[in-house]
Amino acid sequence: MKDKKKIGLILMYLSFGIVMAGLGANDALRGVFSPIFKDHFTLSSVQISMIIVMSYAGNLIFLWAGTRLADRFEKKKVMMGILLIWMIALLVYVTTDNYYVLLITMLFTMGASTLMNTMINLFVPMYFAAPGLIVNTLFFVQGIGTTGSQMILGQVATGFSWWQKTNLLLFSLGLIGLILFLFAGKKAVVLKSETTDAKNDFDSASKAKPKVQMNSPILWLLVLVFGFYFIGEHGVLNWLLLYCKDQFGMDSNQASIYLSMFSGTMMIGRLVMAPLVQKWGPSRSIQIFGGIGTVLYAVGIFCGKPTLMLVGISGLFVSILYPTLLLFVQQYYPSSIASTATGTIISIATIFDIAFNLLFGKIIDQMGYHLGFMILPVSMIIFYLIVNFLIKKYKPLRKLGKN
């Protein structure tokens, strides 16, 4: 029985790892192929930006609806359904050559990708005794997918056919992950430390309608935590390159050093810091790593070009925040509504991302890059203040790891 359970956990981890690598690569494709889309379809800047907007819209819709389905029905089947949607959408990319089809399909691939990412993080605490370690190593694997695809495709992708070939490869990864997950589901066992109703939530269909109190102060504090964090992390990933070029006059090679450093330390940090996250638990880890990361990040931007290197270094500590925040949320809700609560919080917080990206261009036109970019460190500081207030004010309902 123990050997069967161990094999099940290994298969599940391999399944999650393969899928996370594919999801990481999927997330990177927009940036890599945007110039190719622009030339191939003769797109304007507005049409290119619509691809990003559709991606975030997909995140919002899928997280809002998908996590509710996950709390109503058997989570394993919901997860497989989401994975199948992602894979079918990838095949649409492979077999079509039309901007508007790409635009609509982007909603499904990116929405399903983000939801799969969240579902994997909801599964981990139910099956693995060291959720902090497992979650952060899986995000490390995702980082390999993101960074690896950027490096390789950035060198070899010269036309639209590479877009189709890449998505066919991602479909193959999804298929392998699905097969492994099917085998793992027959062997892996829910942890005994979880409640009986939690086990039923993950392994049998739930008849009770899940409810998340929308007037709960905890929910809205968590929305603010994720919302301001999204602006801080995603803002750097989306805008640092242009900031370095337009504000400091760097060429593309110089500017890319800082962005690559941030992305690289993010990937490394999730592997190196994972044992500490497991040792300290979500709350303490967020306080310690969030504090160090926020200070480095803020000083790096506030003090200008001489300290930009600190922004890159901050990725080492910022890296664990998002995966650990996903565990952190689950501590404040019963397992029977953990998926719904997580989806509600992240989907509402995604509006911060959408609003920021829609407005930031206008802000820098009016205020300039120097003042406009200050929104990012201010957002990180607000994130850290709110999450500390939440930790001190409200005790978790359950603990995932030490706190």
List the model feature ranges, each with a label:
Residues 332-369, 376:
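A late C-terminal transmembrane helix in Major Facilitator Superfamily
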Residues 131, 137-189:
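Helix-loop-helix hairpin linking two adjacent transmembrane segments in secondary transporters
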Residues 114-128, 320-333:
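Intracellular juxtamembrane helix-capping segments at the cytosolic ends
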